[in-house]
From Swiss-Prot:
A Pfam family: MraZ
Location within or outside the cell: Cytoplasm, Nucleoid
An annotated GO cellular component: cytoplasm
Description of how the protein assembles with itself and partners: Forms oligomers.
Record's protein name: Transcriptional regulator MraZ
InterPro entries: MraZ, MraZ_C, MraZ_dom, MraZ_N, MraZ_sf, SpoVT-AbrB_dom, SpoVT-AbrB_sf
GO BP field: negative regulation of DNA-templated transcription initiation
UniProt source species: Psychromonas ingrahamii (strain DSM 17664 / CCUG 51855 / 37)
GO MF terms, alphabetically ordered: DNA-binding transcription factor activity; transcription cis-regulatory region binding
Gene: mraZ
UniProt key word Amino-acid biosynthesis: no
All residue ranges annotated as the SpoVT-AbrB domain in the record: 5-52, 81-124
Length: 152
């Protein structure tokens, strides 16, 4: 499973070095292959191990190409989806269009989200975490069924 926030660097060629603690798992799970795409709700990228991405593709394929909202979702997620794999040094290339979309600079955050990573520009990540902590969970609104039953 992918968890934890890791401060890493984007090199001049647009590569990130995946932290060592994830490399064996990624090698065993997906032979180091993954798909990177945009997050449609946050200014970050989503990096899915290939096996997890195939599940996402199945869900996207099931959407209607005649429904404008579903078509828009397919267009954005699939249109930006880029396959890649870890090199022998455990580095992964992030496509220029994806780097531009997420406004990635040299310092980035690789954040495990169980079945995928989020890749953030470090300053944007810090601002997002600050906002999340300040906002907390809203009161006076109806929580989703998942949040009603969620506990730590």
């Amino acid at each position: 499973m992918l968890r934890g926030a890791n401060a890493i660097n984007l090199d001049t060629k647009g590569r990130i070095a995946i932290p060592t603690r994830y490399r064996d798992w990624l090698g065993d799970t997906c032979q180091g292959q993954f798909v990177c795409t945009i997050d449609i709700q946050s200014p970050c990228l989503l990096i899915y191990p290939l096996n997890e991405w195939l599940l996402i593709e199945t869900k996207l394929r099931a959407l209607s190409s005649t429904n404008p909202q579903e078509r828009r979702l397919q267009r954005l997620i699939l249109g930006y989806a880029t396959e890649s794999e870890l090199d022998k040094s455990g580095r992964a290339l992030i496509a220029p269009t994806l780097r531009q979309h997420a406004k990635l600079q040299k310092k980035v955050m690789l954040v495990g989200q169980l079945n995928k990573f989020e890749l953030w520009d470090e300053d944007m990540w810090n601002q997002q975490i600050k906002n999340d902590l300040e906002d907390g969970l809203p009161t006076g609104i109806e929580l989703s069924s998942g949040l009603r039953e969620f506990s730590l």
